Design a protein with these regions (language model features):
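Active-site acidic/histidine proton-transfer and metal-coordination neighborhood
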Residues: 1-46, 56, 129, 133-140
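Active-site glycine- and acidic-residue-rich loops that bind
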Residues: 23-28, 49-59, 84-91
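A structural alpha-helix within SAM-dependent methyltransferase catalytic domains
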Residues: 1-7, 34, 38, 65, ...
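Hydrophobic faces of well-ordered beta-strands that scaffold small-molecule active sites
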Residues: 14-16, 45-49, 74-78, 107-112
């Protein structure tokens, strides 16, 4: 019903996020999310991939992106495995960006991180330490790292 309403209301896309199994049993991997989008069948429901969750659930970042394809990939969080500064941890960003380029995705890539000083959110997301001196530092360094990786693709 929500997807139908969004479609009737205007050019509204709903993106469903794949979240790791420690937080939910619903839509943990890209394959499940694409199936969900197809089952809804309205054409305005897409997949939201999040690197933090992907590193826990997907066997391959590139295969997850290719499973979505341009048709179903609608939004991306480019964050690190610990939700810290992108490009400083375990996420295979080069592989991820190559796959994104291959499918022709041209939507948003958003850094998502959390500051432990925002206690309610930090507690809900299990963030117990700082990843940078300020949120600005995290964003600036993360963006610089991601741009450097993207330049190699």
């Amino acid at each position: 019903e929500v997807a139908e309403y969004a479609k009737e209301t205007g050019d509204v896309t709903i993106c469903v996020e794949c979240v790791n199994r420690f937080e939910t049993h619903f839509l943990n991997i890209a394959e499940d999310a694409v199936k969900f989008c197809k089952d809804v069948g309205t054409g305005n429901v897409k997949v939201h991939l999040d690197c933090f969750h992907m590193i826990r659930e997907e066997k391959s970042f590139s295969e997850a992106v290719k499973t979505c394809g341009k048709q179903y990939l609608g939004y991306v969080h480019v964050n690190e495995n610990d939700r810290g500064i992108p490009g400083t941890g375990l996420v295979p960003f080069k592989e991820f960006f190559e796959a994104i380029k291959e499918i022709g995705y041209d939507g948003p890539l958003v850094i998502e991180s959390f500051d432990p000083s925002f206690e309610e959110l930090a507690g809900n997301c299990a963030i117990w330490r700082s990843f940078a001196k300020t949120g600005e530092e995290l964003a600036v360094k993360g963006l610089a790292n991601l741009k450097a990786i993207a330049e190699t693709v």
